């Protein structure tokens, strides 16, 4: 063995001209990220202990912090086509390099193809021998979705690197809705809870009043956080179920299935019942399904085409009615107003 029989001389050299040792305290993204933990912790639940990875293994705190870092270090003229990394200064990389996350942040699935299903198994054994969730990787998936959402808002409302410039550009709108979502979500939320809180925040936002709901659904669903996605048990990071489905109402808006006005429902708004109306004869019974605004099936009935559809049990709100039968395949919005 060389080490036991010979003397080994080792020379360590430090050349300031070629070796860079950077302090993360000078990395704007890292500084914003760490302050971001205070924002997400203070605004969720009781404001102190509601983002615990030991209670909910889908703890997304690292994701909100990355999102805040990305948003507050946006450059003038930036586009969705420029991928972003986190911690690139501290690692002596370019701002377009990967940084310290599994992939660069980008809505391009060829660059960042991570989705909700990938959170399954994101755990590791720590130095104490305990199996714990990999909160940075889990948060990275959440931030990926939020970053996608930012660029969709930008497509619709425009971009601003200065989120304090005005309240109407897409960058400011999405940041405000994400911030408001923190205040609406329950203690120790899952991805599902976080998604629903952002949807609720958008519905309550007087600038849009729910007009961007389907845009939000499409973004989350594209990464596997669709209508039928399930978080499973909060204490298990291996039982999440992904879904690419969007609410029936959003499918309706996309496909415009009633373009020819071949089908309608009346009265609309309705109180305790409504009727189907078609410009052609309908044979046999029709299956009528009613979905609420979140895409949840709240009523399923089979009725003759001329019979009333009962809505007594439905509270006021906007619904989607889907009617199927022999030669029938229609969808329509319905408002219940009692």
PLM regions and their residue ranges:
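Intrinsically disordered, low-complexity boundary segments flanking structured domains
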Residues: 164-165, 252-253, 296
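Extracellular protease catalytic domains of secreted zymogens
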Residues: 1-247
């Amino acid at each position: 063995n060389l080490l036991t029989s010979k003397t080994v001389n080792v020379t360590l050299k430090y050349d300031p001209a070629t070796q860079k040792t950077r302090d993360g305290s000078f990395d704007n993204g890292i500084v914003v990220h760490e302050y971001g933990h205070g924002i997400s912790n203070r605004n969720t639940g009781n404001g102190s202990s509601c983002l615990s990875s030991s209670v909910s293994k889908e703890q997304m705190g690292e994701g909100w912090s990355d999102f805040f870092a990305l948003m507050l270090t946006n450059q003038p003229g930036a586009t969705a086509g420029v991928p972003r990394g986190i911690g690139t200064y501290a690692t002596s990389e370019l701002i377009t390099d990967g940084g310290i996350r599994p992939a660069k942040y980008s809505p391009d699935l060829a660059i960042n193809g991570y989705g909700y299903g990938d959170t399954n198994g994101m755990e590791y054994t720590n130095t104490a021998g305990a199996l714990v969730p990999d909160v940075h990787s889990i948060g990275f998936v959440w931030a990926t979705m939020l970053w996608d959402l930012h660029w969709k808002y930008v497509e619709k409302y425009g971009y601003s690197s200065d989120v304090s410039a005005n309240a109407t550009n897409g960058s400011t709108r999405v940041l405000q809705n994400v911030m408001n979502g923190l205040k609406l979500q329950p203690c120790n939320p899952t991805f599902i809870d976080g998604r629903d809180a952002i949807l609720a925040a958008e519905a309550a936002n007087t600038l849009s009043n729910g007009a961007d709901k389907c845009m939000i659904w499409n973004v989350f669903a594209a990464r596997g956080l669709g209508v039928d996605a399930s978080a499973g048990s909060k204490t298990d990071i291996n039982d999440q179920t992904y879904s690419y489905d969007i609410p029936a109402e959003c499918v309706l808006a996309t496909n415009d299935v009633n373009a020819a006005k071949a089908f309608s429902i009346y009265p609309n708004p309705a109180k305790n019942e409504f009727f189907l109306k078609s410009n052609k004869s309908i044979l046999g019974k029709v299956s009528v399904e009613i979905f609420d605004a979140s895409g949840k099936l709240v009523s399923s009935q089979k009725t003759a085409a001329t019979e009333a559809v009962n809505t007594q049990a439905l509270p006021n709100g906007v619904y989607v009615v889907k009617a199927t039968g022999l030669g029938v395949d229609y969808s329509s919005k319905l408002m219940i107003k009692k």
